[in-house]
Structures are given as structure tokens and as C-alpha cells.
Amino acid sequence: VGQHPIIGQLQYFLLKIGKGFSFVGRQKRITIANRHYYIDLVFYNRLLRCFVLIDLKTGELDHSDIGQMNFYLNYFKENEKHEDENEPIGLILCAKKDDILQSMF
């Protein structure tokens, strides 16, 4: 619930200054084995020719967040990516910083 204003601001920021970004979805639902999962923001970058998945976290980054993003990236590789496109990129943005764990996939 607290993430929604941040999601909107990030979406606006990327669409205004990010070259090649096209909005795909907010709280994008994917279904695997009859279970629903939600990715905070999904963009497609025409210049990079790949999906960009963004997950927002209110706390510090931990290993389960990284595993979750890898899960989303694998789903997009298998189900959304076309043969002529590059592999998706994942970004995890956290409200709290941990110097050891910072991720961009």
C-alpha cells in the first residue's frame, strides 16, 4: 500500500527521461502453477530490446528478494521474450540501504 505513490513517481520518471522506455504494466500479474505473482513495474526498452522488471521493497534487500526477482526473470525469459530480443533486466529498489546487498540483474 505504501509503495503505490513511489510506483507512480518511478513510472513517470522513466517515461519522461528514460530513452526508449515503454510502459507495459503496474502490478503486472503473472500466473505460474495456478498461483498469482505481481511485479511492481514492467517496462520494455526499445533501445535495449528487452523487458525491464522493477520490484520495490520497503525494507532492506535480502536473499529472498533476489530469488523472487530471478523467478520473475526466468518467467519472462521463458514466456514473454521473443527470439530476437535480449534477456530481461531486473531492478530491485529498496527503501533501506545495505552496503553488502545491492542488486541489479
Where are these regions (language model features)?
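Charged, terminal alpha-helix-loop-beta segments
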Residues: 1-105
